[in-house]
């Protein structure tokens, strides 16, 4: 409960005593909003806000085990790392990247190569180089360029009411090398949960994931990432996990067809 624990926290962390100029810009922004609404510390920071042991060895061992047990069989696969994608089998220069925890359909297997199909959303009026999980939400699936981008198919379009912008659902075909792909998303989310609890508990109690929406998690995590030792892959995986379980996406399955109109 927030009662007694929050009383103890506010003895040390009184809003009036805070010097926002000495805080990280994102932390200062969040604290100003919390102070205005007189939010409880535990609304964002559950648990004890004291230094906890470094848990990085635990989640890094978990990733090594995930990579070692990776099963790339099946028609639907999920990435565990940032993977380059190519316009043609054997190309030396990449035509984009597949981001962690992203779904692909396998069209063909040829030696060490897979031909894949990637589906995602992009702003119709934009450069259409980034595919996202849902329209209007910056949950990144892949970046595309060159021949991969030139040969995309448009499946449907929708208008996001909040911003009155049109988004297009695109389908891209590309090639990638085998490896670092699994046929079940659940082990990736289990690893990402360990990332979250092992990293975000180092400075404070990890906030409830549903406290922020998918786009809000980008700025929130950026404000904290400088205090961690996460590499780019870990950061991307963690962000995807938080966004897929945010206040406006929680419960949506990977590849859910019921995108918000």
Question: Predicted regions: what is each one?
Answer:
Residues 1-2, 25-32, 183-191:
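Short, intrinsically disordered, charge-biased short linear motifs at domain edges
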Residues 54-89, 96-99, 107-110, 129, ...:
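SH3-family beta-barrel domains
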Residues 101, 113-120:
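SH3/SH3-like beta-barrel fold
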């Amino acid at each position: 409960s927030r009662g007694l624990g929050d009383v103890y926290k506010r003895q040390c962390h009184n809003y009036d005593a805070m010097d926002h100029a000495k805080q990280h810009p994102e932390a200062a922004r969040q604290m100003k909003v919390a102070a205005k609404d007189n939010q409880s510390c535990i609304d964002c920071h559950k648990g004890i806000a004291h230094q906890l042991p470094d848990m990085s060895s635990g989640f890094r061992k978990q990733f090594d085990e995930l990579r070692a047990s990776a099963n790339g069989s099946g028609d639907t696969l999920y990435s565990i790392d940032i993977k380059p994608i190519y316009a043609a089998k054997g190309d030396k220069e990449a035509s984009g990247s597949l981001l962690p925890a992203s779904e692909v359909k396998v069209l063909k297997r040829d030696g060490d190569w897979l031909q894949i199909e990637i589906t995602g959303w992009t702003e119709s009026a934009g450069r259409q180089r980034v595919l996202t999980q849902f329209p209007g939400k910056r949950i990144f699936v892949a970046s595309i360029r060159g021949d991969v981008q030139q040969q995309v198919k448009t499946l449907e379009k929708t208008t996001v009411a909040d911003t009155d912008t049109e988004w297009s659902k695109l389908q891209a075909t590309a090639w990638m090398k085998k490896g670092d792909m699994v046929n079940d998303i659940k082990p990736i989310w289990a690893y990402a949960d360990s990332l979250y609890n092992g990293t975000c508990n180092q400075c404070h109690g990890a906030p409830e994931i549903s406290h922020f929406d998918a786009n809000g998690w980008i700025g929130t995590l950026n404000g904290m990432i400088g205090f961690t030792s996460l590499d780019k892959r870990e950061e991307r995986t963690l962000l995807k996990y938080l966004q897929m379980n945010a206040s406006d996406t929680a419960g949506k399955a990977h590849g859910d067809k019921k995108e918000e109109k």
